Amino acid sequence: MTTMDTQQRIKQQVESHPVVLFMKGTPQFPQCGFSALAVQVLNACGVKEFATVNVLADAEIREGIKQYANWPTIPQLYVNGEFVGGSDIVREMYESGELQKLLEQTSQKA
């Protein structure tokens, strides 16, 4: 069970950055194929900067993020404070062009 403090920390991260990816590892060294795919998709969309949270570095965040969005898997992408989805949804949205449209609404796209 995660504490309210953990949920507050997650909320603060999500609301403080236009694009946030909760992932296993880092963009330079992703620790799972799904996290690597999410990073590749964001890069392919031309996102210059996005915040990342390595859930492997914090067990409370790793469990808390699953409760925060009621989504059982990682990675999780948030854009403008809203949960977008995991790697499958992110990939599908990229392939359909929906993700690019959503990301254009942030200031992080050139």
PLM features per residue range, with description:
Residues 1-20, 110:
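N-terminal leader/targeting and pre-domain segments
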Residues 3-7, 58-62, 96:
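Structural motif corresponding to alpha-helix initiation and N-cap regions
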Residues 11-49:
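Local sequence-structure signature of Cys/Sec-based thiol-disulfide redox active-site neighborhoods
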Residues 22, 76-80:
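Acidic beta-strand-to-loop metal/phosphate-binding motif
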Residues 47-62:
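Thiol-based oxidoreductase modules, predominantly thioredoxin-like and allied folds used
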Residues 67-73:
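Thiol/disulfide oxidoreductase modules built on the thioredoxin-like
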Residues 79-109:
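Non-catalytic, surface beta->alpha helical segment in thiol-disulfide oxidoreductase systems
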